[in-house]
Swiss-Prot record:
GO CC term (a single one): cytosol
Catalysis: reaction(s): apo-[ACP] + CoA = holo-[ACP] + adenosine 3',5'-bisphosphate + H(+); apo-[ACP] + acetyl-CoA = acetyl-[ACP] + adenosine 3',5'-bisphosphate + H(+)
Gene name in the database record: aasdhppt
Cofactor: record remark: Binds 1 Mg(2+) ion.
Protein name, UniProt field: L-aminoadipate-semialdehyde dehydrogenase-phosphopantetheinyl transferase
Subunit description: Monomer.
Amino acid sequence: MKLSALKRCVMGSVRWAFQCGSWCPSQAEWLLCARCVQPEEKQRIGHFMFTRDAKAAMAGRLLMRKVIADKLQIPWDRILLERTGKGKPFLTGGSSSEYPCFNFNVSHQGDYAVLAAEPDRQVGVDIMKTDLPGSSSIEEFFRLMNRQFTEKEWNSIRSMNNDWARLDMFYRHWALKESFIKAIGVGLGFNLQRIEFEVSPVTMEIGKIYKETKMFLDDEEETWTFEEILLDNQHHVAIALGEVDHLQHQSPKIGDVAESTFTLLNFEDLMVSAIPMSDEDPDYWINFQSKQELPFRQRRSR
């Protein structure tokens, strides 16, 4: 199909965040959410052992459907999402061929679920919460994770002046690596030693977007752009942005029109475009209510 025959979404970059950690859904809210996702996703979310994980997964699915409904103007109940063999969600069905360059990705960890979407670029997003490791010391934790980073990256992590700053730099590097892996959709089989990040600046301010970090793949500097932002003093978000091959020489890019920052959505924002796709299932609420929010060990550590 020729490019001129394809639709390009009239949108800029999208950055949304939802505080799923503090979200305490009512019975009506949770049952409405269950009606607004695909049956297989409803079932998958219902199998989580803890409500924290179920809420995060539900928020992620709703964010994906919202961005497609709002930005591509596809009715919510006509959106069909599938996963690649490596687990990356994508839009399928008749509408997907009309917007072949539209990309989106979600991540949830800590207190937030986040979404990044682009009209004409590859995108991967990851969020990491800086927190103390469970039962091991920071040094033991770093030892166990030694193979995930290059020597230069470990030098950057260990150069920080206290344990918390070192842990924070660790999770910053981790989010960067995960954002790239998610953008290219290769899953867990990718050797993380092949990619190396040169982070800049060392210190970040909350709410400010940074684009100075560089990535090297097999020792060669790449042209990918990495956006970084601190949502608060514990949550670091990294967004990997790469060119779609057949659009590399087109200018200007829609996604470069405006600076992108994260918009914090509330539950009403999240559901404003939602259209239920199934009947209400009261047992789904009973199942949700029967679960603990967190594992016992994590509840004690708070």
